[in-house]
Amino acid sequence: MSSRTVGSLRHRVRAAALQALFELDQTTHDLDSVVARISDDEMFSAEGRDFFARIVNGAWVNRQEIDDLIAKIAPSWPVHQMPGVDIAVLRIALFEILYDAAADKAPVKAVINEAVELAKHFGSDNSGRFVNGVLSTVVNKPESEE
């Protein structure tokens, strides 16, 4: 598969993951049923289904730790008051950067760029800048401060 095809697949998967995480956060729907339904609706390839399930499950399972990290980095913005799109985008990106151990893991810069693009497209006028600021702080933070 070409890098352009992989990139567009990952973009589609991340956009669908944003939808799934937003839905999970706003409803009482079951994780497995949301993942199955959206994955079926999107008609992903096997590779796309695997990536989708990995990032949605990973971001959702690790959301408390991810949210705690966001709260430390952006104390003026309580996580429970953040727009749902922003928090979903941050959960996806921070899962990929900090928790994803897959061999085909995307480079950090690619994850940040994609997160900023998703935030700009689906979020408010300030979402892209906010997401970029949080992710840049995480990536540039010395390990001794974590």
UniProtKB/Swiss-Prot annotation:
It holds the Pfam family NusB. The keyword Transcription regulation applies. Transmembrane segments: none annotated. Keywords: RNA-binding, Transcription, Transcription antitermination, Transcription regulation. It comes from the Bacteria. The keyword Transcription regulation applies. One of its GO terms (molecular function) is RNA binding. GO terms for cellular component: cytosol. One of its GO terms (biological process) is DNA-templated transcription termination. Belongs to the NusB family. HAMAP family: NusB. PANTHER family: ANTITERMINATION NUSB DOMAIN-CONTAINING PROTEIN (PTHR11078:SF3), N UTILIZATION SUBSTANCE PROTEIN B-RELATED (PTHR11078). Involved in transcription antitermination. Required for transcription of ribosomal RNA (rRNA) genes. Binds specifically to the boxA antiterminator sequence of the ribosomal RNA (rrn) operons. This is Transcription antitermination protein NusB. The lineage of its organism: Bacteria, Bacillati, Chloroflexota, Chloroflexia, Herpetosiphonales. The gene is nusB.
